[in-house]
């Protein structure tokens, strides 16, 4: 598994900072946000690799960097960590053909499109880089990963806004179940912390603006003072493998994907339906496909974006779990890293697997005063040690798309 | 070496990320310097920009080596 996020670079570095209750959110540094309503975001810290920060040239050769938007850079960083961590190095042509890639993004190369638009607007269309299109296309993370490692199996990509990461992992696991591949590199990557991205989500009144002077307080899922999400950037990538295939080669196995459910709201382009009934149906379908009962689930990594929709998701989880909710821990790790849009579901599925590995529920930061009381423990402020055998991770996207994935330790 | 040759060399080094010593007049962008077809398109654009010349597509297709580029630009500049 591999992560690059506002908490830094690398799986264990991210996890230990998350569990310690640290925040990766700050004032936007990559450009001056003063003219925009929202001034805060979660940006990947730049610095020496050994300090858990990003030095891009350690991962992507300098001459190739300009051929890719930043979301591809970040996807390649996390994919490199994940593939190397998995120890899977297919030597034979057959093994390479049985290894595929499904990495998505919610938006893709937004800054690249912005820059290219200006070039054309200025009447310099003939000066547009030949790398503009392949730099911006969402499926090019999958393309670059396949080229780097020679993975010749299914090469696919997902675009379902903020549900992308879960859909990629869920769909890739289904491809393995269907026999299309033995190994799939799956996840999401996003880098939309740019003027156009911040301005666009601001116009939709989706971003927090009340905490511009206290950035680490801005992402506060379920808290009564929340006022919108905080955008984050990064990537989360997993290597999925057919169980017997992984066992036979003695692979390090973090966990097993046991359930996956999807639904559509058929309601509104950005707002969830009443009672988040689409979320309820996605979670229900995931539980059904896992063949478990809700009381088996010890931890839910909520979509919990720090918007009004948090309480609707809470209602849907309460409805699904019933009395079993009293034993449940549910947190939103977006409180620490912000909303990574198309990468969110993948990063959060990884956090869910690590929650099982270490029997720790990561905290919901800034949950000072819940706007709604609940029997469900939302792990306010501090991580909790508790027995977690099975975890569920939710992601919901604009367009009314919902996905839930269930993981179990091995 | 002419000023044009120096500048061409610098652009090639910068765009293809190769060592200066490899950028000999005979070096082929694709065979010797690791460029692909899109790299050569970008390279020609960079020449156009740097020398304020127009390199039409049929001429660009014939520019395969460092020397080809230098010769073409010198000819345009002399004209």
Swiss-Prot record, chain B:
The modification O-(pantetheine 4'-phosphoryl)serine is found at residue 37. Pfam families: PP-binding (PF00550). It is found in: Cytoplasm. Coiled coil: none annotated. The keyword Isomerase does not apply. InterPro entries: ACP, ACP-like_sf, PP-bd_ACP, Ppantetheine_attach_site. One of its GO terms (cellular component) is membrane. GO terms for molecular function: acyl binding; acyl carrier activity. Residues 2-77 form the Carrier domain. Keywords: Cytoplasm, Fatty acid biosynthesis, Fatty acid metabolism, Lipid biosynthesis, Lipid metabolism, Phosphopantetheine, Phosphoprotein. One of its GO terms (biological process) is lipid A biosynthetic process. Pathway: Lipid metabolism; fatty acid biosynthesis. 4'-phosphopantetheine is transferred from CoA to a specific serine of apo-ACP by AcpS. This modification is essential for activity because fatty acids are bound in thioester linkage to the sulfhydryl of the prosthetic group. It comes from the Bacteria. Belongs to the acyl carrier protein (ACP) family. This is Acyl carrier protein. The lineage of its organism: Bacteria, Pseudomonadati, Pseudomonadota, Alphaproteobacteria, Acetobacterales.
